[in-house]
């Protein structure tokens, strides 16, 4: 089942967060959902060169919060923050409400080569430049391994290298445990438009397992401490800055 279902959808609330965080009654819910889709489409088309990994949207009363995860924040922010104002006015025009308060937060992706969407975007760019797909996949795997990922799976489907019959090929390096719900799996898809048609790209990145605090593994050679009943928890107060 883990290989059939969407890796992100099955892990929502466990290791993944919702991309849209808001509540609305049943009458306005479809309108706000379409509004989110228009905002994401507008941002992805406007900032193609910014390497946007994800767009998170939150709503609080009349305020709209948009968080952009990007590999190149300077492209969005612009000189002296002029790009933020341009983006804010563009979002207000897209949703058709010039008076809506829009708050924008730009977050830089620390490890670009460990992000599934940015890896898929890199593969799509190379395929559109007519680079052989096996060479492209090998280069993407090397970049991800240098970034320190624990596992990676890449699948490319379509008329590979201009073949008459479409097929799909995939490769995997390391562990990609799709059945383990506590495994942090970053999943993304991308479409590459080539002269022979479109190629579908899927990328799975395994970044580790997220364990609850009570299930954290003990250090090697240590044993669990015995319970001493309902002992009062110790409290420590930092007084290092007090004058003597």
Curated annotation (Swiss-Prot):
Set out the biological process GO terms recorded for this chain's protein. translation
The UniProt entry's GO CC annotations, sorted and at most eight, read: cytosolic small ribosomal subunit
Answer yes or no on keyword Acyltransferase: no
Which UniProt keywords are listed?
A: Ribonucleoprotein, Ribosomal protein, RNA-binding, rRNA-binding
Question: Which stretches make up the KH type-2 domain?
Answer: 39-110
Q: Which GO terms describe its molecular function?
A: mRNA binding; rRNA binding; structural constituent of ribosome
Report which superkingdom the organism of origin falls in. Bacteria
- The biased composition feature labelled Basic and acidic residues covers 234-244
Q: Which SUPFAM superfamilies match?
A: Prokaryotic type KH domain (KH-domain type II) (SSF54814), Ribosomal protein S3 C-terminal domain (SSF54821)
Annotated region described as Disordered, given as residue ranges: 214-244
Task: Kindly give the CDD domains that the UniProt entry links to this protein.
Answer: KH-II_30S_S3
Stated role? Binds the lower part of the 30S subunit head. Binds mRNA in the 70S ribosome, positioning it for translation.
Give the similarity note: Belongs to the universal ribosomal protein uS3 family.
The record's note on quaternary structure and interaction partners says: Part of the 30S ribosomal subunit. Forms a tight complex with proteins S10 and S14.
Which protein, by its recorded name, is this? Small ribosomal subunit protein uS3
Tell me what gene encodes this. Answer: rpsC
């Amino acid at each position: 089942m883990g290989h059939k279902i969407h890796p992100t959808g099955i892990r929502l609330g466990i290791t993944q967060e919702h991309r849209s965080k808001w509540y609305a009654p049943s009458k306005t819910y479809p309108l706000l959902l379409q509004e989110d889709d228009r905002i994401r489409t507008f941002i992805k088309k406007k900032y193609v060169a910014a390497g946007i990994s994800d767009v998170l949207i939150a709503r609080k009363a009349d305020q709209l919060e948009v968080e952009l995860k990007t590999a190149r924040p300077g492209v969005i922010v612009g000189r002296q923050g002029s790009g933020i104002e341009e983006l804010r006015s563009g979002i207000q025009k897209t949703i058709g409400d010039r008076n809506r308060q829009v708050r924008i937060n730009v977050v830089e992706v620390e490890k670009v080569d460990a992000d599934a969407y940015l890896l898929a975007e890199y593969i799509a760019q190379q395929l559109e430049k007519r680079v052989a797909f096996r060479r492209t996949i090998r280069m993407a795997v090397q970049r991800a391994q240098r970034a320190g990922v624990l596992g990676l799976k890449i699948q490319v489907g379509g008329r590979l290298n201009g073949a008459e019959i479409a097929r799909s090929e995939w490769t995997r390096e390391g562990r990609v445990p799709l059945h383990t719900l506590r495994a942090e799996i970053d999943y993304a898809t991308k479409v590459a438009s080539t002269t022979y048609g479109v190629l579908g790209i899927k990328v799975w990145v395994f970044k580790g397992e997220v364990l609850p605090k009570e299930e954290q593994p003990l250090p090697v050679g240590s044993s669990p401490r015995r319970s001493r009943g309902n002992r009062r928890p110790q409290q420590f107060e930092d007084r290092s800055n007090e004058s003597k």
